[in-house]
UniProtKB/Swiss-Prot annotation:
Keyword Iron-sulfur listed: no
Species of provenance: Haliotis asinina
Annotated localization: Secreted
Expression sites by tissue: Component of the acid-soluble and acid-insoluble organic matrix of calcified shell layers (at protein level).
Name by which UniProt lists this protein: Uncharacterized protein 2
Secreted found in the keyword field: yes
Amino acid sequence: PLGAATSNIPPQYARSTLQPTGLTSRAQSYPTNTNPGPSAKGNLVLPLNWQLLNSPASQIPTQSTTTFRSNPPLPPVVPGRRNTSPFFFPKPTRPLSFRQILDFLGRIRATKELDCKTVSEALSLNLPKFYYPLSCDDKCPPPSVCRHVGLVGFCCPPHVTDQLIWMVGLAERFKVLGG
């Protein structure tokens, strides 16, 4: 007898095929259909991805592809120890881009041009030339004010603001690039 092949295709779209007789119960529980697409008869228009949407693979529940990664733990802060590198950032695994380095160096040069001094220079301390304290909070002699460029602290004249350092830093960066 004629019968529709059992699959996930709705019966109105299934093509009628002859079922061979004498199939075992196992073979009957896993029917096959050589052409699971809709019949070519009629004026039925289906989307091109119809077979993909109605395939057995689309019925399988899948796990979410979103995975949440936590950031690696930061090393513990040891009191009394400072990293003397001005390029040290909390995430050392992520390298700085050339633009970030140029921006940092431009702002360092801008602080020098605006008469800012590191804490060791402002307090006339005998520290190595390239030693940059991480902070200048409550260390700048009056009337100078504390300004930070990255992690480097500077004692600047009162008229110098962070925005002024940034703008002069842009000009310094263009000088470095030859612009």
